[in-house]
Structure formats: C-alpha cells, structure tokens
A protein has these predicted regions:
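Short hydrophobic beta-strand element within catalytic cores of glycosyltransferases
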Residues: 82, 156-161, 569, 585-596
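Catalytic binding pocket for nucleotide-activated donors in carbohydrate/polymer assembly enzymes
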Residues: 511-520, 574-645
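N-terminal pre-catalytic "stem/leader" segment of glycosyltransferase-like enzymes
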Residues: 2-71, 99-291, 665-708
Length: 708
C-alpha cells in the first residue's frame, strides 16, 4: 500500500511521502491549535511544518512543485502560518497588546522585503546567464567575467529568505507562552534586520565590476576565439537532459579526429550533463546567435540526432552536413526520412546501407558512407578482457546481462521486452542450473511514457534483488570477504580522489564562472580516465562474482557490463549491434510475436541471435552456448554478422572515420572554391558590360551612382 502511495504521489521514498503527509496535516493542526488556543500544540505543529517543508525542498519533491501550481506555494504556506500565529494571539485575549501590533507590522514589513529580494536574485541570475556558455574555450583572456556571488546567497534563495521569519515566530511564541515581550521584540528585530541585510548583500552584484559583460561582448569574444582556433569539424547536438548520452558517446571519437574539432550544443542542460572532454564546447541556446556565429572555417558538420533545431546549422552552405546518429539498429529511427536533408549519411557497415535501400525513404545510395563504429573500441572479446576483470566476472558462474530498451513513443509492443517477457527472462536466468549471475541494466528512459513498463521494471528489480538475497544465504556460493573489503577500500580511495579532482575544476561557480574557468587540465583529464578504469575493476571485485545486480545510473557504463558478461539478452536497439562487436552469444526477444523467420527478415542484427518468445522458453540455447562455447552453432554466424553490421576490423574504425571526414572536407572546399570562382566570373562579366565612362558600384558607394 505504501509503495502504491509513493507511485501515485510521485515521491522518491517512504520518508518523502511521510514528510508530504506532515505538511498536509500540519496546517490544519496549526489552525486548530490557534482556535483552541494552545501555545504548545501550535509550537509543535509549527516545528513539524517547518521541518517537513524544508526536507521536501531539499529533496526537490514533485509534490512541492505541484503545490505551487494550485496556489499553495512556498510564500503562501509561510504567510498562512504567520496569519495563524496572529490568530493565536487574538484567541489568547491579547487584541490590544503591543506585541500583536508588532507581529502584524513585522509580517507586513517582512513581506515587503520579498519583492526587492526576489527582484535582485532574478536580476543577478539573468545578468549572469550569458548568451553562450563554453568549455575548453579561452574567453578569460578576451573578456572579464567576474566571480559568481557566493552560493549561499542564491541557492534556494527564496526558501532562505522566508525562513528568516523563524526568529519572529519563535519570539512571539515565547511571549504567548511565557509573557516575555523582550523575546518577541528580539525575534521581530532579528527577522527584519536579517531580511534587510540579505537584500543589502545582493545589491553589489547588480552594479559595477561584479556585472558580467553584455551579450554583444560575449558573442564578439566567441567570434574572436573562433577566428583564432579555426575549427574544421563540428559535432552538433540538441536534445533533452536524458538524451545527453547520445552526444557523450561521440566525445572520444571527436578527441581522436585529425581535423580541429568543435562541439556545438543547443541546451544548457546538455552542457551540464556532458562528460569530461578535451574538445572545445560551445553551447548556443539562441538560434539567431548560432546563425550569426562565424563558422566559415568549418567544412564538416556531424549530427548525432534528428531534431528540429538542426535547421539552424543545416542552413549553412559552406560546410557539408552528415548524419552519424547515436547507434546503429533496425529500429525505424535508424531510417528516418529526415536523413535525406544531409549531404551524407554515415553507417557502421553494409547493413546500414542496405537498411536505407530497403526503407526507400529518399536517401541516395551514393550519399551513404560506411565508417565503422569508432566508439565501440572499449568493447572487448572475452579473451581480450583483462585477467582482473575476468576474475571479478567469475568464470565459474558466468554472467548474463539483461539490457532491455525502453518502451518508445508509439506503444508498439515490439519496442521492448520488459512488459511482456522481462519477468519470464529474469526468472529463468536466476533459476538456471548450472547457475548464472544476472546483471539487469534497463534503459534510462524506461517508464517515462508507459506506466505499465515502469511497473514491470520495478517488479523485475524486486525479483533480481530477492534472488540476490537468496543466493547470499546459499552455502553453495562462497565469497572472499577480505578481497571484497579490499576492493571497497580501493573504491573509496578512487572516489575520494575523483571528488578532489572534480572540486579542482571549480564546480562551485555558476555557468558564467564555469565558462571563464572551464579549460580542461590535460594531465588531470588523463588521471581521471585512469582512475575511472581502476574504479571499474574495483567495482566488479567489491561484491561476490555470483551476486545478481540491478545496475542503473551512469556507472558502471553499458560497455563495462558487456566486458564482464558472457552473454546478453536484449531487444531491437543499438545495444544489440554494439554487443555484436564482442563476438559473444546473445538473445533478442520477439515481443511482437512476428515469428522467428519474419523477425530475422525484418531485423538484421538478430540473424545470429537466439530468438526468444515472450515466454523465454528458448533461453536454454543461449545458456548452452555460454557453458560450451566450442559447440556454439551460431559462433560463425556472429563473426560474419559482425563484419556486415560494423564493418571490417581493418583498417580500424577511427581511421575509416578520419578518412571520411577528410574526404568530405575536400568536397566542401571544392564546392566553396567553385562558388568563389562563379562569383568572380559574375563580377568580371558585370565589369565588362558596364557602359563607357561607368564603373560598378563600389562597396563604399552610398547610392550606387557612378563618377565620370
């Protein structure tokens, strides 16, 4: 029942649900205590509402956001509590006492301070929100960007300001209970004094040298940097916070480009969720600002997603535009008709080319280039996995990864196995004999569209956690507590060092300060990469090799899960195509029940897979391949399919990718040279046809008149 209430209220935990209930019940209790009247009861209810409200705000509760939508926002709740305190004084037969008038005057004056406080905080935030935010771009030498105000002044500023009424409320309650007018006066004085002080502390940040430069100066500095840096290849991305992984997967590839790279983002939220990189990053939310940027040296633009904002860069004719996507699969999204707006579409292997031919959505065959998948380099075949990771993966109890995709937007039952087959798959895996370990890593979008998918995910999570608890109590499975303790100590050390390195990046500032100081330290970047690799090894060794796990969040990454797994179960998505790079056995669920032959006909990536029905009855074939690799009947098919989907192993994918960039850059330059030649020829023709005694208008002629 509690879990149902948590889902309905959209809160994160039972504690959050309890705090929400206390807020809802606390205000009626305040009114009742004021009417009785009872000072102790009122004080107790006030403490409860203060603490519960603060807890919900600290958690960023969904309910708190909803209250503001029904005119019960933060300011209203504080005002109601203060009015009820005045009611308490009236009910205590103190209508003519100076403290009553003082309380009323205090709360009126206190609320009069809210307007300048809110105006100042809004003005500071707006002025510090520059038209462009960057990383790894040297703006510090070009414009002066002052330090951000102390975080304690702006972070949750409205809540902090309103909580200054605590002194007045406490003092008035002391007076109501004990008759001490001095306590009331002191509380009222502190509330008003601190409120005025808060407003005064904000004033310096809206004047003088504490104000960041205007937008025109920032944009001019960006153009000056672009002219000096001369970017040649751009990775362009626009999307929601949850889609940041789509651009993050290309960062290492951009770092390894031969051409000078630049990343252009359109949303600040993507910049905030961007993984560390050495590539210069420019976030330009405004379309007009982007279209006015000087990108004349860029010859190739790469697009990782088909979104409406792409048009703002697609309109630039001096560069060639390429769709590279964010995964290679047989989903309809992989053959989006929108792709025909690009000069070229790059696919991993021959399968991508054939996919467009079959779909017949207007993408020309000569516009398709096979470049491999350079971001798959971290995926390793089992024999290439380091020994430390193989030990952690537990060769005696092989690991099977269940990585279903999400439900999608269209309600197609074939999108994900999680609803119709997920529980069957996990039940059979946790009950397998000989045993296997299950890693369950759902797609981060799971449950965002379909409540049914969200419910299935929670049931599968509970199933995995229950099986893990049962296995931990099973004496057949032995662990090494000393080794696990050592690994956990190593994890703590690595995480502490990563925290220090993250703090050294100046993360305490705001966006403007991050733009000023956000030039990556190459040595620190290398150290972070090394530490993350060490963290991954320590993570897998920090718990028994037989322990089932639910893995969510950014770490460990999907490819890390690939490397410790002997096999995978998934759905039609780029996850399958990526896993094929490992050469390991895999199974794919036919959730739409098309039948094996039709399912394989429609989906290239499953041609070397074990095909599962929703009952998962065929799962035994996958487990047989794990236990006896030499007798695996699909091993040869997987090798052939890997080449078809992902291209040849040689030359390396990054080399193919660099060659494709260079080739397209030459085409772009040839086009631009042709345009310049035509423009020159047109100008010569105009001069040749000019009447005797006339000349063509010069750039500095104001009316186009000629001179004799």
């Amino acid at each position: 029942m509690i879990s149902t209430a948590i889902r309905v209220a959209r809160v994160g935990s039972a504690a959050e649900l309890a705090a929400a209930a206390l807020v809802m019940l606390g205000f009626p209790c305040l009114m009742l205590a004021a009417l009785v009247p009872s000072v102790p009861a009122f004080a107790a209810a006030a403490v409860v509402t203060y603490l519960a409200d603060h807890y919900l705000h600290r958690k960023g509760s969904y309910l708190i956001n909803r209250l503001s939508k029904v005119r019960a926002g933060l300011s209203i709740r504080f005002l109601i509590r203060q009015l009820l305190l005045v009611l308490l004084l009236v009910r205590l037969s103190l209508p003519g006492h100076a403290v009553l008038y003082g309380a009323i005057a205090c709360f009126i004056a206190f609320y009069s301070l809210q307007a300048p406080h809110g105006a100042l905080t809004t003005l500071i935030r707006n002025r510090r929100k520059m038209p462009v935010a960057t990383r790894n771009v040297d703006l510090k030498s070009r414009i002066r960007i002052p330090d951000a105000p102390p975080r304690r002044l702006l972070h949750r500023s409205a809540e902090k300001m309103l909580h200054l009424d605590l002194f007045a409320v406490a003092g008035i309650l002391v007076f109501a209970g004990l008759g001490s007018a001095v306590a009331a006066a002191a509380g009222i004085g502190l509330t008003l004094g601190l409120g005025c002080l808060y407003v005064l502390l904000l004033l310096p940040y809206v004047r003088g040298r504490k104000i960041p430069p205007k937008g025109e100066a920032v944009l001019s500095a960006i153009d000056d940097w672009l002219a000096a840096y001369r970017p040649e290849t751009v990775l362009y991305f626009s999307g929601s916070r949850n889609s940041a992984y789509q651009v993050n997967m290309w960062l290492q590839t951009m770092e390894r480009l031969d051409a000078r790279p630049l990343i252009i983002l359109r949303e600040r939220v993507i910049l905030n969720n961007l993984a560390p990189t050495t590539v210069p990053v420019v976030c330009v939310p405004g379309g007009v600002h982007l279209m006015n940027m000087d990108l004349s040296t860029v010859r190739v633009a790469l697009y990782a997603a088909n979104v409406g904002k792409n048009i703002h860069l697609l309109r630039v004719p001096t560069m060639k535009h390429v769709f590279i996507g964010h995964g290679d699969s047989d989903k309809l999204a992989s053959v989006n008709p929108f792709s025909k707006v690009y000069d070229e579409v790059w696919t991993a292997g021959r399968a991508g080319r054939d996919r467009y031919v079959i779909a017949d959505v207007g993408v020309r065959d000569d516009a398709i280039v096979e470049v491999g998948r350079p971001q798959l380099a971290p995926i390793q075949a089992w024999e290439d996995v380091p020994e430390a990771l193989r030990d952690a993966a537990g060769e005696g109890v092989p690991t099977v990864l269940y990585a279903p995709t999400w439900e999608g937007w269209d309600g197609n039952p074939g999108n994900t196995s999680i609803v119709l087959a997920g529980e069957n798959i996990v039940e059979k895996l946790v009950q397998a004999d000989p045993p296997v370990r299950v890693l369950y890593k759902p797609h981060p979008f799971t449950g965002t569209v379909s409540a049914e998918a969200g419910a299935a995910h929670r049931r599968i999570t509970a199933l995995v956690e229950k099986a893990a608890a049962e296995r931990a109590a099973d004496r057949r499975f032995a662990s090494d507590p000393a080794a696990q303790a050592q690994a956990k100590t190593e994890l703590d050390r690595i995480e502490a060092r990563l925290a220090v390195l993250a703090g050294a990046d100046g993360g305490k500032g705001d966006e403007a300060e991050a733009t000023r100081d956000g030039v990556v330290d190459i040595e620190r970047h290398k150290e972070v990469a090394r530490l993350r690799a060490e963290w991954n090894t320590a993570y897998w060794r920090s718990f028994p090799a037989y322990e089932h796990r639910v893995i969510t969040g950014a770490e460990p990454r999907l490819y890390d899960c690939f490397n410790v797994s002997a096999a995978m179960v998934s759905d039609i998505s780029s996850v399958v195509s990526d896993f094929i790079a490992s050469g390991k056995p895999y199974a794919v669920t036919d959730s739409a029940e098309l039948g094996v032959e039709e399912f394989k006909r429609q989906n290239t990536a499953v041609r070397a897979a074990v095909i599962l029905s929703n009952s998962a009855a065929e799962l035994g074939s996958l487990l047989d391949a794990v236990r006896a690799p030499a007798a695996d009947p699909l091993a040869g098919d997987r090798k052939e399919l890997k080449r078809y989907l992902l291209g040849p192993d040689e030359p390396k994918s990054i080399d193919q990718f660099n060659a494709a960039v260079a080739d397209l850059a030459l085409k772009s330059e040839a086009r631009n040279a042709g345009q310049r030649s035509q423009a020159g020829a047109a100008e010569d023709a105009e001069l040749a046809t000019a009447l005797p005694g006339q000349r063509s208008p010069a750039a500095d002629d104001t009316d186009g008149a000629t001179t004799p």
